[in-house]
Amino acid sequence: MATTLSSSSLFIQFRGRRYNSLSSFNNLQKRTVLSLSCALSSQGGDMIPPEGKSNDRNSAFDFKSYMIRKAESVSAALNVSVPLQEPLTIQEAVRYSLLAGGKRVRPLLCIAACELVGGDEATAMSAACAVEMIHTSSLIHDDLPCMDDADLRRGKPTNHKEFGEDMAVLAGDALLALAFEHMTFVSNGLVAPERMIRAVMELAKAIGTKGLVAGQVTDLCSQGLNPDDVGLERLEFIHLHKTAALLEAAAVLGAIMGGGTEEEIEKLRKYARCIGLLFQVVDDILDVTESTKELGKTAGKDVMAGKLTYPRLIGLERSREVAEKLRREAAEQLLGFDSDKAAPLVALASYIACRHN
């Protein structure tokens, strides 16, 4: 019997048993993501199956397989979206970063949100690709000498190291434009025009001066500041805009494309905001606890640059506590949705909390 969630009475019916509290629901979540495990390998973020894994396929969601399938689908769609054509140099620069792998968390989130509200992968794919194009654009620009001056990204030389600063700037610009072109062209006929207009507005807002750009500017202006003079409010502003805004857009776009109601869209917005902050808190922790080899990028760079980070402001232990609190808050936003369809998003929050790179 499928799990039944009631947001009004807050009980959960699962195989004839009733759970009447959020803590009971959290226990159910642990079984739902049993196959996830917090043990991650140091290469590519692959999950190591935990000992004693349940053989009951109905009680455990295989997030690893789900993530691999979605990442492969997204990568195939991205490959088609940027064919090699003249001028070859810019196309090669675009493809170099866009097809460099990665966990594809943002497009996965977009697709899972679409499926949660009744849509399917095909309907969400153009938006999922658009979000990944913008994410890649932001990474190319973020790595430039005038920004973070990074040498490695996903275990490879950064775009400007491979193609030069001029071509890297243009590759990032091209991806930004291509994202909107791709989403609107490919989705034509699949999504109602009014929903497409809203999706475009949401995505544009997420990456402009009310979103990603605002976070990057505040981050740059905060380098070298004394942590004692800067509160958590400023750090949260940076991460809500620089990191969470695009994750939020991914979830909202998926819900819009899938025909979600206003209530469903807002629940997914709050969920994504929580995992967006969670993603960055964990990123800050990994920057001081993992090696360059494990991360696929230069470890300790934020500390060396004097950046504001959660460990720098509140220490490692409190940072871990904040991460767990955000994971729980994200899961709470999924109460009321069909549990089978929500399983990928429950697992995604746990994956982000437990990742090693």
Swiss-Prot record:
Q: Cystine bridges: which residues?
A: none
Which cofactors is this protein said to need? Answer: Mg(2+)
**What residues span the transit peptide?**
1-37
Identify the main location. plastid
What note does UniProt attach to the cofactor annotation? Binds 2 Mg(2+) ions per subunit.
- List localization entries: Plastid, Chloroplast
Q: Which GO terms describe its cellular component?
A: chloroplast; plastoglobule
Q: Which reaction does it catalyse?
A: isopentenyl diphosphate + dimethylallyl diphosphate = (2E)-geranyl diphosphate + diphosphate; isopentenyl diphosphate + (2E)-geranyl diphosphate = (2E,6E)-farnesyl diphosphate + diphosphate; isopentenyl diphosphate + (2E,6E)-farnesyl diphosphate = (2E,6E,10E)-geranylgeranyl diphosphate + diphosphate
Record has Transferase as a keyword: yes
Which residues are listed for Mg(2+) 1 binding in this entry? D142, D148
Among its keywords, does the record have Chloroplast? yes
Q: Which InterPro entries match?
A: Isoprenoid_synthase_dom_sf (IPR008949), Polyprenyl_synt (IPR000092), Polyprenyl_synt_CS (IPR033749), Prenyl_diphosphate_synthase (IPR053378)
Q: What is its EC number?
A: 2.5.1.-, 2.5.1.1, 2.5.1.29, 2.5.1.10
Residues recorded as binding isopentenyl diphosphate, renumbered to this chain, are: K103, R106, H135, R154
For this entry, list what GO says about its biological process.
carotenoid biosynthetic process; farnesyl diphosphate biosynthetic process; geranyl diphosphate biosynthetic process; geranylgeranyl diphosphate biosynthetic process
Q: What keywords sit in the KW lines? A: Carotenoid biosynthesis, Chloroplast, Isoprene biosynthesis, Magnesium, Metal-binding, Plastid, Transferase, Transit peptide
Q: In which pathway does it act?
A: Isoprenoid biosynthesis; farnesyl diphosphate biosynthesis; farnesyl diphosphate from geranyl diphosphate and isopentenyl diphosphate: step 1/1; Isoprenoid biosynthesis; geranyl diphosphate biosynthesis; geranyl diphosphate from dimethylallyl diphosphate and isopentenyl diphosphate: step 1/1; Isoprenoid biosynthesis; geranylgeranyl diphosphate biosynthesis; geranylgeranyl diphosphate from farnesyl diphosphate and isopentenyl diphosphate: step 1/1
Annotated signal peptide: none
GO molecular function, a single term: dimethylallyltranstransferase activity
Give residues annotated as binding Mg(2+) 2.
D142, D148
Family according to the record: Belongs to the FPP/GGPP synthase family.
What this chain does, per the record?
Answer: Catalyzes the trans-addition of the three molecules of IPP onto DMAPP to form geranylgeranyl pyrophosphate.
According to the record's subunit comment, the protein's assembly and interactions are: Monomer.
Q: What is this protein called?
A: Geranylgeranyl pyrophosphate synthase 11, chloroplastic
